[in-house]
Amino acid sequence: KQDRLDGYFTTHLTSEMSQYGKLSSPIYLENWYWFTHPDSVNKDPKKLRYGVVHGSYQANWFKTQNITSLLEVNSLEEIVNVLHHHRVDKVLLDLDDFNNAADHLGIDASAYPRSFYRYVPLGVFAANKLINSHPSFLEKFDETIPQCAPAPFYLSQGEQVQILNTLLEPIKALISQPIITDAAAQSNHIKLTNKALKLADDHWIKEVKTHQHDLAKNMLFTDASLYLKQWQRQFKGIITEIIVTDKQGKNVAISKITSDYWQGDENKFSLVYQQSLAYRFDSVEYDASTHHFQVQLSLPIKNAKGDHIGVINLGVDVEKALHSFNNNALN
């Protein structure tokens, strides 16, 4: 506020901060969950006692919510212990932090009902004066993040189970439909050389970058692609995109325009096609333009004989999915 700093690291963006600068792309993701004492599950929400670690990101968030029934402690293990002894009813913590602290204290973490709240991206906050004097700073900084950021962020086992419980069977039904298997099989009759694949991919990418989209639009209105879009609507934004490929990784059907034509050089294809996995989740990715977190879910497409003939990749809006599943569980 006093214009004395160019920025600071690491932080999350609050509504108060937004007028003073911008946040970089995430360097790290925190996975915030509500943890409730078992005896407080049915307690009147207006009477809940909350706990928080002093000076934490969660403490800053609580201030913005005007929650006054708040016990502040000095450490992560202390807040978990306070919940364990029922001095508070509910805490908001990163999932891994809670599990690790509970394990260190010899507390059974699974005994505490939990519900997903949100992902919190942590990055470098650049003040307006830094951005004004160095307009390209954030763009260049964001480009270097993959080289120095921690390991990719993956869904927890419990989160994967939640998503699969809702999506796996409908996806299996989708990829068994003749309109999908026939499209993949027909494309497999046209095998391209590596050189031809590269040329086709480059052509597609060039068109997308120049907003031509001729190749992509032609594919977007095939029967198989239209079927994907119709199927996708039932999930009300949880599924953000669908790509069906043949056994070479070439696009066969798409629910929206994709950035490239050939998926064969990407993990979402190569680690699923002709492999033993029934499905695969990729790492969670952050879309800075939409502020959404997405994960790719991939499954092999098989013919009636059980042979692999392609792969389906689905983009899943993780926050929307987990919130939806939590709400359904409560109803």
Q: What kind of region is each of these model predictions?
A:
Residues H292-N328:
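Conserved beta-strands of PAS-like sensory domains
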Residues Y28-Y33, H104-D142:
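Periplasmic-binding protein-like
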Residues K1-D6, E77-D97:
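Short helices/loops that flank or line small-molecule/ion binding pockets
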Residues H37-I67, L71-V73, I79-N81, D96:
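Bilobed "Venus flytrap"/periplasmic-binding protein-like clamshell domains
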Residues P150-F153, Q157-T258:
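Extracytoplasmic/periplasmic sensory segments of membrane signal-transduction proteins
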Residues K1-K47, H54-S56, N99, S110-Y119:
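Acidic, polar ligand-binding/catalytic clefts
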Residues H213-K229, I257-Y286, L330:
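Extracytoplasmic/periplasmic sensor domains and loops in membrane signaling proteins
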Residues K46-K47, V52-Y57, P121-V161:
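Extended ligand-binding regions for polar small-molecule ligands
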